[in-house]
Amino acid sequence: MKVNDRVTVKTDGGPRRPGVVLAVEQFSEGVMYLVSLEDYPLGIWFFNEMGHSDGIFVELAE
């Protein structure tokens, strides 16, 4: 995923929420995405762990 991609994010117990990627940071354990959400227009960070499906919080929107 890259900046300006439309995504959905997994949050605690609720439905996936739509957003837009504002920034991407690569790490050895995975990738951090700064995602603008309706409640957080300036963005909130989400981490996608590599190799662990439970650790995937950001996905491309369909």
Curated annotation (Swiss-Prot):
Pfam families: DSRB. InterPro entries: Dextransucrase_DSRB. Belongs to the DsrB family. This is Protein DsrB. It comes from Enterobacter sp. (strain 638). The gene is dsrB.
